[in-house]
Amino acid sequence: MKKVFTVYCLLLFIGASAQRFPDAVFLPNIRTAKLFSQNNQESMAIVRLNSSDLLELHFDDVDPTPKNYYYSLELCNADWTPADVNTFDYISGFTQVHLSEFRPSSITQSRYIHYQTLLPNKNCMPTKSGNYMLRVFLDGDTSQVAFTKRMFVVDYNKAMISAIVQQPYDNQLNKTHQKLQLSVNTMALNPINPQQQIQVVILQNYRWDNTCLLYTSPSPRD
């Protein structure tokens, strides 16, 4: 028996309490840190598990002196707290990867260095689906974090999601709200306690500062 979780909600776009670990920049010399699907700067940082999907990481350092930046990937829970799992249970390869591709600015009044890379790669490959925190840090020292970014590894063989956006029945909400009919087919997941294990997070234009967090009850279907 497959289980389908159906949710009807009005998107109020209020901040969710699960927002504990936002994307952040920690060094003042870092500018325009971006992480997105390859060749699509407007996309979220999502890759399919065991696929050839790639993400592009870009950022500028306004200090014109080249530095040794590294990145790491950490599996997180639904609320973006670190998962209590050994790194090598979800990463194949190294725990840190050196960012070796960079170039100095040219024909600009302000000097800076642009760093970029494609990930994941064979040096650091996620082996489990889930929420991942990308950390960029200096000199292989994880205490010198430059910035963090969220990314997602998805497995469509485990669950499928479908959604229909509709106008609210209340005319007073037509211009400010949306009604969402959402179905999550867990297929191979078979959660034991779906009320705790299944969470749905709604984003408005990829924004994390006003997420809508939903908890659902199962509706079994054959």
Residue ranges and their predicted role:
Residues 1-21:
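Bacterial Sec-dependent N-terminal signal peptides
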Residues 24-25, 153-177:
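Low-complexity, Pro/Ser/Thr- and charge-rich linker/hinge segments at domain boundaries
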Residues 128-139, 203:
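Internal, hydrophobic beta-strand segments that form the core of beta-sheet-rich folds
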Residues 215-222:
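Conserved small/polar residues in nucleotide/adenosyl-binding loops
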